[in-house]
Amino acid sequence: PVGWESSRRHSSLTTQLRVWHAANEELGEAFESSGGFTLPSGAIRSPDASWISRQRWDGLTPEQRTTFPQVCPDFVVELRSQSDRLSSLQEKMREYLENGTRLGWLLDPKHRRVEIYRPGYDVEVLENPVELSGEDVLPGFVLNLRKVWG
């Protein structure tokens, strides 16, 4: 469990993703932190928020959907809490990319800093951004960071 402030931030993050998802269900499926994935490397991970494309979701059997399926999310978000070591989260973000993630955001509320991870590119660091775009991975999704930062 996390403290109330971290819980509020998680709630804002997942609510914004779910609202976008509700209007774009044909594109894929969104998940919050209790949903786990078995990455192709064999590691089991549960990002704070994630999304997989409809094509990849439809490729899973009904049985696989009830477990931690062997699939890496197309999109992941990790939200740093007070107890998280930044280096551990950065390692996790690199692991997601190595296993097939197409877009990843590491949000650090304490420093109001975002690291954006994309395959084949250096990590992009933003200081105190107000919003983030889902780019071509989540078309039309914009995360309002003012609601996450609080």
Segments and roles (model prediction):
Residues 1-150:
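Gly/Pro/Ser/Thr-rich low-complexity, intrinsically disordered segments predominantly at protein N-termini
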